[in-house]
Amino acid sequence: MAAAAALEAVAPLGTLWGLVQDFVMGQQEGPADQVAADVKSGSYTVLQVVEALGSSLENPEPRTRARGIQLLSQVLLQCHSLLLEKEVVHLILFYENRLKDHHLVIPSVLQGLRALSLCVTLPPGLAVSVLKAIFQEVHVQSLPQVDRHTVYSIITNFMRAREEELKGLGADFTFGFIQVMDGEKDPRNLLVAFHIVYDLISRDYSLGPFVEELFEVTSCYFPIDFTPPPNDPHGIQREDLILSLRAVLASTPRFAEFLLPLLIEKVDSEILSAKLDSLQTLNACCAVYGQKELKDFLPSLWASIRREVFQTASERVEAEGLAALNSLTACLSRSVLRADAEDLLDSFLSNILQDCRHHLCEPDMKLVWPSAKLLQAAAGASARACDHVTSNVLPLLLEQFHKHSQSNQRRTILEMILGFLKLQQKWSYEDKDERPLSGFKDQLCSLMFMALTDPNTQLQLVGIRTLTVLGAQPDLLSSGDLELAVGHLYRLSFLEEDSQSCRVAALEASGTLATLYPMAFSSHLVPRLAEDLCTEESDLARADGPTRCSRHPRCLQALSAISTHPSIVKETLPLLLQHLCQMNRGSVSPGTSEVIAVCQSLQQVAENCQRDPESCWYFHQTAVPCLLALVVQASAPEKEHSVLKKVLLEDEVLATMASVIATATTHLSPDLASQSVAHIVPLFLDGNISFLPENSFSGRFQPFQDGSSGQRRLVALLMAFVCSLPRNVEIPQLNRLMGELLELSCCQSCPFSSTAAAKCFAGLLNKHPAGQQLDEFLQLAVDKVEAGLSSGPCRSQAFTLLLWVTKALVLRYHPLSSCLTERLMGLLSDPELGPAAADGFSLLMSDCTDVLTRAGHAEVRIMFRQRFFTDNVPALVRGFHAAPQDVKPNYLKGLSHVLNRLPKPVLLPELPTLLSLLLEALSCPDSVVQLSTLSCLQPLLLEAPQVMSLHVDTLITKFLNLSASPSMAVRIAALQCMHALTRLPTPVLLPYKPQVIRALAKPLDDKKRLVRKEAVSARGEWFLLGSPGS
């Protein structure tokens, strides 16, 4: 028995010995992993591995010793967590001793020490012992890159786990690391080394007398000029090194006396990258420096920054110079002063003012903008700096404004003033008398009003912006100023005939200021706009078309623009609704465009109200019943043939009203939405008009029963309401409503009504929680679709229902969506519905604007397009190959729609298999297919040049053919693709260059300007192809 046990014990050790010999003598790498796996599984211990390696570790041949230690180190790297404390001690002593061995052995020794540096059982004191041994015995910079990286890893591991022990070394640790790093050149190692230096400083390791040495050993790499080689497998970018080194240089004020002269030297150099890096580093340093560090260098720093802003041709250098000046000023602003200390901020700003003030007064204004930018960069750093600069510069600029009489010069000066006014908004002042602008208030207002009344449009625009900024300063504008300002805004936004930009700016300013000064706008602007609306109504009654055509929309825009405060909304909303009602009571019916203009103004007011729950509910309960009352009255049977009905019930008008109702509903709280739904659904199902204003309607309102075609059209408004409700709002009589919608969706008498019903049904399906009721609704829909598609006059309506139900289910990943999509694919071969089915794929992949939107609380999964692509494109491709020739265009069209709306990262991996179909789609005679495919291919030319290069001959031929298409949109897209082709590898394109340049001469004479523009752009790129620097 004992003999058997001994044999069993010896057998595995024999195996271990064999693996060791295979590794050491056979130069095979596999046995090391096998030994490590056996140690982890418990078959052997680390001690047994050491014993098996005994002869190898003591072999007189260095290479054999190196292989033995390499095996042990590889095992330890995988099994260090299994080591006991006493094992770690012995191994550390062994490896430290081996650091004195032959240079061939050192790499393997370092790998072993790296493994031991990861041990949680490492006893106190051994980390210091290891690092001392490395610092003393190893000349790190003579090692290969990978071994130097190992040393940095050992240091990093010990700094992470044994910080206090290492700090006990004092400055010796810092000096040792300086010796390790000195002379490092490999970017992979530098990234780790910079991180170590940063930790040395940020974690308060002792630098002792070696501050300058540590600075020198890192700053010698500044500025970084590393350029990664092509196809660099390590992925290290120049920016990575720049940021790591910058973090080190800017980590301590103790580097300031050495770093700031270096930065000044590099800013003054001729190398653009060095200027940028130096200015950005200075910016970072200012976050940790104080006045003491900057004091001696401020004149030189200011001189360098001033020169760069005044003289540089690079916008980036100018921007970085201004940012550095801002940081310098901020640093000087936040330093705490002693009572007897010099105020460096004051003297620094005085120097800036001294060097810049006189440029503001030069007649040619050559250096006005650079000087203003410098002053504003300094002023934007702190409240103190802003006060100092503004109080010195504003009087000068105000004086200059009056000295110059030309509008362009005045505009420049006012823009500079505006820049300083904007800076004042950054700082708050408890006492309004302390505000620097208080003393200039009258002069600024005078200047602003002069600009607003100047005939120069550009000066007016700056005046409007100045008014907005001054108005944002609390208590700066008096009531008289506000009344005058409102009058100017009224004039500019309502009366000016020749400046669209001024009108837009005045409306925007009105909206901003109305939020701040609602009383002023209620008192001085709303009454004037109300009066204008009354004038419009009388013009409308007289059919005075030319008079009202331009004034009417401007008045409406002004009313909606100022509806940014709840108190103003309560005045403007009734005005707009009353105006809409009055328009429809006149003897002459308004035009469609005029009714739409009113609805668009209501839409903007609704959007403004979404910011405030109270205003949102006020708008909803005021506007929605009023709009419904208007259209319900217009849809009454006795008004079937009236002009009023024709306007209010037109598709465009109802679509605009639907948008207003949806916007007014999406932001309602569930409680308030429940109150509203309790009125609106019964209105459509039961004809309950009791909640509508002026509800003295003759006849009945029954859009789902035997109602007139006009009443059925109003289902579009029901759709807008119920499809915008929060998901947790319960809809009354839902079963009945879904049934009525289903019936109406397949009604052939009015396509507008049936489509609205189908969309409404789909919108409710999408939000309905999973369960038996949803399954019942879906079964009803499928039965209705199949019955309608089988035969009869309602096939088109049944198809529309199928399409919208499919989309509703695709968006929420419902299992039935796959079956419905297959049904849709089957219709691609249908002679009557095939083209519409192909276009249906565009709808399935697109975002809707009226129903099934995230804003309307629909369930829209974030990856629905990717999932649809994965599930259905293979079937589309198979269907294309199997389809008859006359049906293939439908499959191509559907496929093109899917691919065109697919995120490009999803499409790129599938491109090789799909590209042939896309190229075939370009030969399809359908211009929609051509345009969709071109739109899909253009970004692919930029993102997948290698794949596209394989088909360059076909691509060029097809693109050039389509550049002569009858469709302007196709011609433009084809020329854009010809332009994008130039991003393919140049050697692939050069053989085609003469042919393409000749062919692109023809569209240069195209009758459409936009086509000619694209042709010029594309031909120019082909001309440059292969030239030096292209």
Swiss-Prot record:
InterPro entries in the record = ARM-like, ARM-type_fold, MMS19, MMS19_C, MMS19_N
**Positions of modified residues (Phosphoserine):** 1027
Report the PTM annotation. Ubiquitinated; undergoes 'Lys-48'-linked polyubiquitination.
The organism's place on the tree of life at top rank: Eukaryota
Q: Kindly report the protein's main subcellular placement as a broad class.
A: nucleus
Q: Name one GO biological process term.
A: protein maturation
Cite the GO molecular-function annotations of the record: enzyme binding; nuclear estrogen receptor binding; transcription coactivator activity
| Keyword flag Iron | no
- PANTHER family in the record, alphabetically? DNA REPAIR/TRANSCRIPTION PROTEIN MET18/MMS19, MMS19 NUCLEOTIDE EXCISION REPAIR PROTEIN HOMOLOG
- Entry's family note: Belongs to the MET18/MMS19 family.
What is the name attached to this protein's record? MMS19 nucleotide excision repair protein homolog
| Lineage, top ranks | Eukaryota, Metazoa, Chordata, Craniata, Vertebrata
Encoded by which gene?
Answer: MMS19
